[in-house]
């Protein structure tokens, strides 16, 4: 782990795994309390997809980073990869679940059952002019900005395609599929980060400092993956 190659490949996966575990605990408690109404099926669906994909990616990348030892049965990577396959397909294909998540989200927003959380800062005017956006406060605002922006974009595109005569099925499967996947992921990752921030409130001292660093790494990795979106939308400086 002293090598930069290992750190850059494995530490973001570890940070995301820990963050997803906090998110899973939040969803489990919400399901038990049945306190979030319409959102419960969406939360259960999105945490299942996110943890399944993370499991598959972690197993694949970790096997590669172990080199030849990754082929040994004692390393158990074959077992992990087989289990990850189940995570991706059991109880509904993950990509199909993402469609359900967006359908429920857009329905809740349209019916006023749900209001998308707003960033605390003006993302384009303030965060978009900063040299360092790595604090949890700024990262949280960026996640919320991505969610609301994608939601606006997909609503506008769906309406335009409907006017062109496309059916709802054609719009979802042939016209806005990429946006649907991005929006569902943005919804899940925003919920994940919010649950991590809430969890930090229960910690103090060194525990809080360490876990804040973990959650920042997980969030920064998401922003790095979607950097093109943030630069295009002027939410981050080029």
Which functions belong to the PLM regions below?
Residues 1-238:
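Flavin-dependent oxidoreductase catalytic core characteristic
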């Amino acid at each position: 782990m002293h090598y930069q190659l290992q750190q850059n490949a494995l530490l973001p996966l570890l940070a995301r795994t820990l963050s997803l575990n906090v998110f899973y605990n939040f969803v489990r408690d919400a399901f038990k309390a049945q306190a979030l109404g319409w959102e419960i099926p969406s939360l259960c669906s999105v945490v299942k997809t996110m943890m399944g994909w993370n499991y598959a990616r972690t197993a694949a990348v970790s096997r590669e980073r172990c080199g030849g030892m990754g082929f040994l049965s004692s390393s158990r990577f074959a077992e992990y990869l087989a289990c990850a396959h189940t995570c991706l397909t059991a109880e509904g294909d993950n990509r199909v679940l993402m469609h359900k998540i967006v359908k429920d989200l857009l329905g809740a927003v349209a019916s006023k059952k749900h209001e998308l959380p707003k960033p605390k800062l003006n993302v384009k005017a303030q965060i978009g002019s900063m040299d360092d956006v790595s604090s949890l406060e700024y990262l949280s605002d960026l996640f919320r900005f991505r969610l609301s922006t994608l939601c606006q974009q997909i609503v506008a595109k769906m309406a335009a395609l409907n006017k062109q005569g496309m059916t709802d099925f054609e719009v979802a499967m042939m016209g806005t599929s990429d946006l649907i996947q991005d929006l569902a992921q943005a919804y899940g990752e925003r919920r994940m980060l919010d649950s991590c921030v809430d969890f930090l409130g229960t910690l103090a001292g060194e525990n809080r400092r360490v876990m804040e660093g973990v959650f920042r790494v997980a969030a920064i990795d998401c922003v790095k993956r979607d950097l093109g979106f943030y630069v295009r939308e002027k939410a981050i400086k080029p």
